[in-house]
Amino acid sequence: MLFQNKYMAITVNDINNGVMIQITGEVDLSISPDIKDKILEQIDFNKKEHNFSISKSIYADLSEVSYIDSSGIASLIQSHQQAAKSGVNFYLFKTSPGVLKVIKLARLDSIFKLV
């Protein structure tokens, strides 16, 4: 467990082809910067460890996110952009119905890789 408060938690686990960042709870302005920081840390780690030669994937597991606001969406967009610049695949994994609805309303489902 990397970060936890009474409303949410962030965990990071290595998987075969990359890293799974599981986000649980509510994602709002109070926590969005922490989420972005954890994702960017993994992007930077991937760059340093693999010297740009092997690109691992980062999966943001949003299956247990009960709420997301515009700051949370902005953090995901910034993470997606930084991953693309770094040659790292960034996926939104198992988005919860509420999060998926927000992503589709904002027409971001054509930008994010949803798995």
Task: Enumerate the language-model features and the residues they cover.
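Non-catalytic signal-transmission and effector/linker regions of two-component phosphorelay proteins
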Residues: 1-14
